[in-house]
Regions:
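The conserved beta1-alpha1 loop
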Residues: 59-68, 170, 223, 281
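Secretory targeting and sorting signals
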Residues: 1-28
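Hydrolase active-site cap/lid region
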Residues: 150-200, 217, 230-232, 236
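Short substrate-entry loop that stabilizes the transition state in hydrolases
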Residues: 54-101, 176, 286
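Short beta-strand/loop motif that positions the catalytic acidic residue
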Residues: 221-223, 227
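Short beta-strand immediately N-terminal to the catalytic nucleophile in serine-hydrolase-like folds
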Residues: 142-144, 169, 222
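A domain-start/cap signature at the N-terminus of enzymes
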Residues: 22-60, 73, 78, 82, ...
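Gly/Ser-rich "nucleophile elbow"/oxyanion-hole loop immediately N-terminal to the catalytic nucleophile
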Residues: 52-57, 105-150, 157-163, 214
Length: 304
């Protein structure tokens, strides 16, 4: 089942031709592997990109790859390093070592604050950067595509004390993929058949870190209407979840079209955009194209 289900995700490397617009110059900083960065229960690899010029207290962006991908592949095939050069933030590229090359977004451990597995390993990477690179703990964010988008939801759900916001490209809500039998795949969720009330979705996040009363992460969600791998209903379910976590309603504050085939809905909290959903009309699972990363960076405040 997992092998068949992953076939749609195996196509993710085709985004390489769509995402990158210009190669880094010869004088650009290089991606480096970091070892011994802290607790790492699932043996993730850590790759780090620090631009030649960073801000005095740089922000940190975790950029998580798709299934079958890797940290170096996501570095090469996306715009985030180039945008880091422009705006002076640091990018962490986690890399899965298990056979599927998919992030663990399903186990009870990864879905619980301090529970273990991939989410804890990634938090260790962040803490390492905060300590070694004088980065700003109040400006830590996550993004990713497909499996990486699902991990983005996991990180914001289980570690709201670490991540202030995220941008998830073609993912599913936090805990939608939850399993207890060791499986990496949840067909009901992937097929868009797991439907809950906003309260139920929000409760899943709140139970991941009981007693947490700090700031709620901001979330930007992207999904193609023709996604046949992680189907489009997951987009609406994720909006339900993150608006409920923020304590705001389901009615958009505003709706517009930044591009002809995009419909963007925004949900404000205290006059600022807390949740943003961008529906890509006729977009497939691999809808991501050049320029979308800039929208994500702008939403997260990394361009300021």
């Amino acid at each position: 089942m997992l092998r068949r289900a992953l076939r749609g995700l195996l196509a993710a490397p085709i985004i390489a031709a769509l995402l990158i617009t210009t190669a880094p110059s010869a004088s650009a900083a290089q991606l480096t592997q970091v070892t011994n960065f802290g607790p790492n229960p699932s043996n993730l690899q850590m790759y780090l990109y620090v631009p030649n010029k960073v801000k005095p207290r740089p922000a940190v962006l975790v950029a998580s790859h798709y299934c079958t991908g890797s940290g170096p592949a996501f570095y090469t095939n996306t715009e985030f390093a180039r945008l880091a050069d422009r705006y002076g933030f640091i990018v962490v590229y986690p890399s899965v070592t298990r056979a599927s090359k998919c992030f663990d977004v399903a186990s009870p451990q990864t879905l619980r604050h301090g529970g273990g597995s991939d989410s804890l390993g990634i938090v260790s990477m962040v803490r390492h950067v905060l300590q070694r690179n004088n980065a700003d703990p109040n400006r830590v964010y996550a993004t990713g595509h497909s499996s990486g988008a699902m991990m983005t939801n996991v990180l914001l759900g289980a570690y709201p004390d670490v991540f202030r916001g995220g941008a998830a490209f073609a993912g599913v809500p936090f805990a939608c993929f939850a399993t207890t039998n060791g499986s990496e795949w949840n067909s009901q969720c992937a097929n868009g058949q797991l439907v809950k009330t906003p309260q139920q979705w929000g409760d899943l996040v709140r139970r991941a870190f009981p007693g947490y009363t700090g700031p709620k992460p901001r979330m930007q969600l992207w999904h193609g209407t023709n996604d046949d791998t992680l189907r489009y209903p997951n987009f609406g379910e994720a909006i339900k979840q993150w608006t409920n976590v923020a304590g705001i309603g389901q009615t958009p504050t505003s709706t517009d079209r930044p591009q002809p085939n995009w419909v963007r809905t925004r949900y404000n909290l205290g006059g600022a955009v807390q949740v943003e959903g961008i529906s890509v009309q006729n977009g497939s699972h691999n809808f991501v194209v050049a320029g979308m990363a800039q929208y994500a960076v702008d939403f997260l405040g990394l361009s300021r």
